[in-house]
Amino acid sequence: ICYLTFDSDKIQYVKRSLNEGWIDIAKHKGINFMVLSLHEVLKEFFKQDDYRVDAGEDAVEDEFEMKEVYDSLGENLKNQEVLEEAILSKQEDVKKEKNGVLLITDIEAIHPFTRFGPIEQKIYGKVDVPIVVLYPGEMSGSALKFLGFYPEDGNYRSKHF
């Protein structure tokens, strides 16, 4: 796993550059990126979560209740290891590709539910393919600060660029 770190105010630039040529350049050099968007993973999970619909409709008028619903959704996401399972599942597709590399995008979508460090901790020993994570945040020595405002997290085991 390696992190390509960039300032969070560059999210749109990185996304546009990725779509406008970075993947094509990599393919030309023999690297086959397979993209996993964490935004898409979350969207699919929450779309299928009946609790989100029922509780969300009841809480829409009450800010405290809405925060409780939001916190519960985050707990469901973490307890079911939705993101971890999506990464490990996509890894199986990458294994079938010659020179396959898993490219994880849109990790800003996991805020405020979690950060990527705890996800890496859970999957680290199960990773069998190269993974590149587009990481909006800051490097601080050997630590990373997700989105530039979370506290430094020195628990990342991987390389940071």
Predicted feature locations:
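Short acidic, S/G/P-rich loop/turn micro-motifs used as interaction or catalytic elements
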Residues: D9-Y13, V41-K43, G74-Q80, I107-P112, ...
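A short acidic (Asp/Glu
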Residues: Q12-L18, E44-D49, P112-P118, S142-F146
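Structural alpha-beta junctions
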Residues: E20-V35, K122-V132
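Long, charge-dense
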Residues: F33-E81
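Conserved P-loop NTPase "ATPase switch" module shared by AAA+ and STAND
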Residues: K96-F113
